Curated annotation (Swiss-Prot):
Gene: atpI
Transmembrane segments: 38-58, 95-115, 134-154, 199-219, 220-240
Domain of life: Eukaryota
Classification via Gene3D superfamilies: ATP synthase, F0 complex, subunit A
Record-linked PANTHER family: ATP SYNTHASE SUBUNIT A, CHLOROPLASTIC (PTHR42823:SF3)
Biological role: Key component of the proton channel; it plays a direct role in the translocation of protons across the membrane.
Chief place where the protein resides: plastid
Protein's organism: Piper cenocladum
Protein's name in the database: ATP synthase subunit a, chloroplastic
GO MF, one example: proton-transporting ATP synthase activity, rotational mechanism
Subunit structure: F-type ATPases have 2 components, CF(1) - the catalytic core - and CF(0) - the membrane proton channel. CF(1) has five subunits: alpha(3), beta(3), gamma(1), delta(1), epsilon(1). CF(0) has four main subunits: a, b, b' and c.
Organism taxonomic ancestry: Eukaryota, Viridiplantae, Streptophyta, Embryophyta, Tracheophyta
């Protein structure tokens, strides 16, 4: 007889959890703009971690690299290889951009699973991975869109726009739409995957003993890394495509 009330209470609990995760925000008024305060806080933490780690690792570069220097050299080599594969021989100027995107997204995604954000109480909302907020993922996707337009115009001048009528002018609307949907697909893919991962872990922790969600958390770490790689790879591929002029 108590099954139905219990089920209703369980569903209500899940609804409350999801409401906290995606519906409440700490708003800051900066000038005439209203921003999500918790996103800025966690983003600053991620940036501080990245800058601090790099500064400590390479402040005293050695001819024979230490462990930390070795690690960052490996990361740089990985990003250079990724950029060269997707962009081509003119990849050099784009390595800092692709590397910044990859590292920020990677650390942001992992921070959602590894950092004890929940113990920090806010007046409204709660701290989570920066990429758990659609504003962050859109802010990452828009510079990518600007970057591939800039790359194409720099390489080809106004002739870049001729690609919209290739192979036939009848495809003009579709080709234009394709370029403007790229940032949407980048931002929503990253946001959806990170949000879903965090919600799944929160729901499992609330329903079952804490040891059970651990495999899901490890899977989330793997997925978070893959999402950072996908974003960086697609960003580099879009830049390379705009410079080469083929789809």
């Amino acid at each position: 007889m108590n099954v139905l009330p219990c089920s209703i209470n369980t569903l209500k609990g899940l609804y409350d959890i999801s409401g906290v995760e995606v519906g409440q925000h700490l708003y800051w008024q900066i000038g005439g703009f209203q921003v999500h305060g918790q996103v800025l806080i966690t983003s600053w933490v991620v940036i501080a971690i990245l800058l601090g780690s790099v500064t400590i690792a390479v402040r005293n570069p050695q001819t024979i690299p230490t462990n930390s220097q070795n690690f960052f050299e490996y990361v740089l080599e990985f990003i250079r290889d990724l950029s060269k594969t997707q962009i081509g021989e003119d990849y050099g100027p784009w390595v800092p951009f692709i590397g910044t995107m990859f590292l920020f997204i990677f650390v942001s995604n992992w921070s959602g699973a590894l950092f004890p954000w929940k113990i920090i109480q806010l007046p409204h909302g709660e701290l989570a991975a920066p990429t758990n907020d659609i504003n962050t993922t859109v802010a990452l996707a828009l510079p990518t869109s600007v970057a591939y337009f800039y790359a194409g115009l720099t390489k080809k001048g106004l002739g870049y726009f001729s690609k919209y009528i290739q192979p036939t002018p009848i495809l003009l609307p579709i080709n234009v739409l394709e370029d403007f949907t790229k940032p949407l697909s980048l931002s929503f893919r990253l946001f959806g995957n990170i949000l879903a991962d965090e919600l799944v872990v929160v729901v499992l922790v609330s329903l079952v003993p804490s040891v059970v969600p651990i495999p899901v958390m490890f899977l989330g770490l793997f997925t978070s890394g893959i999402q950072a790689l996908i974003f960086a790879t697609l960003a580099a591929a879009y830049i390379g495509e705009s410079m080469e002029g083929h789809h």
